[in-house]
Amino acid sequence: MSSILSRYPEAETPVHGYFYSMVELAVVRVFVQHEIFDAIADDGTSIEELATKTGMEMNLLERLSNFLIASKVLSSPKPGFIGLPAETKMFQQRRAKLFYSHIFDAFMGSAVKWPQYLQTNGLAEPQKSNRSPFGLGAGYPDKSFYDVLDMMPERAQAFNSTMAIGLGDMPITGIYDFSWVTAHAGTDPKRTLIVDVGGGKGQAIKAIIEETPSIPASACVLQDLPNVIKDTPEEDGILRKVQKVGSSFFDKQSTRGALVYYIRRVLNDWPDDECVTILKNIREACASDSRLLISENLLPDEPSVSLAAADLWMMNFAGKRRNVRMFNDLASRSGFEISSIAKDKMSNSAVIEMLPVQS
């Protein structure tokens, strides 16, 4: 707790420090939303001029600014003026504004409901996607994250805008060697080589084929919900050749006996029981020599602050970051066994290869 006291030296106790931190988070959110930081000149701006520029009542602006000046988020070059320290200037950048707003709205709006959520649902991690802290915080306690976004277009737009800037994106290629798939390309021309399950608009399958061009695109299948599949860019030469199937991974797998079932950044979003449903649907479609490849962030046994925070972020939506033991549990419950794990050297990304257990 010493870190919170060093952040706010006048805090009498850690509790006071956490209170000051909450105040700072909320005031910064208001400043970001109303572009107050953007209106502050490099050499400082008077509170009166800033109120005129932003349309905020001067009394409110002064009260909010007083705290940010006291906490060193803002500076005061002279009485009645506000300045921007170098580190705060990042809030003039679109990327930082989008990300901060997203994590504040999605995380804090959910986290304040944790006590109520756990009181109602028991002291356990979310068991169902339609029983999540996010849904409770948004006013829809029986809806999943994606259901809530469907009902709240503004939040969906903010979410999509933040995701579009690629914060913390994980690599697709360079982790797992797909060259072995090439050897099977000519043995059975009718066999599907790779099924990209829940593959969105085809970013991953395209990257895999570009990395290993000897894999014929026509022997690959892109699967996602019909409304996602219809937006796949047909002008792309590779994706034009890939077969498209509109389906849900919660339904029976329609492509049977494929060599590889590839699923990237999907299981991360769902609780264990629903992941088992997804994997069992794949297992039921597997041939004896099929392989399942799961591309996800792999949680170390002793995660850093950032990784542990990311896991709790996912908990808000009933999702979960998993370590090797957790993936082993999913495998054994779904009729698979882990055969290898390929890890990215520069991140926590990994491709977990599983084989169907033969009865």
UniProtKB/Swiss-Prot annotation:
Highest taxon, organism lineage: Eukaryota
EC number(s) from the headed UniProt entry: 2.1.1.-
Positions that bind S-adenosyl-L-methionine: G198, G199, D224, S248, F249, R264, R265
Signal sequence region: none
Catalyzed reactions per annotation: trichosetin + S-adenosyl-L-methionine = equisetin + S-adenosyl-L-homocysteine + H(+)
UniProt keyword annotations, A-Z: Methyltransferase, S-adenosyl-L-methionine, Transferase
Phenotype seen when the gene is deleted: Abolishes the production of equisetin and accumulates the intermediate trichosetin.
One example of a Gene Ontology biological process annotation: secondary metabolite biosynthetic process
Molecular function GO labels: O-methyltransferase activity
This protein's record includes keyword S-adenosyl-L-methionine: yes
A Pfam short name: Methyltransf_2
Listed pathway(s): Mycotoxin biosynthesis
InterPro entries noted in UniProt: COMT-like, O_MeTrfase_dom, SAM-dependent_MTases_sf, WH-like_DNA-bd_sf, WH_DNA-bd_sf
Protein task: Methyltransferase; part of the gene cluster that mediates the biosynthesis of equisetin, a trans-fused decalin-containing tetramic acid with antimicrobial activity. The PKS module of eqxS together with the enoylreductase eqxC catalyze the formation of the polyketide unit which is then conjugated to L-serine by the condensation domain of the eqxS NRPS module. Activity of the Dieckmann cyclase domain (RED) results in release of the Dieckmann product intermediate.
Family per record: Belongs to the class I-like SAM-binding methyltransferase superfamily. Cation-independent O-methyltransferase family.
UniProt protein name: Methyltransferase eqxD
Encoding gene (name): eqxD
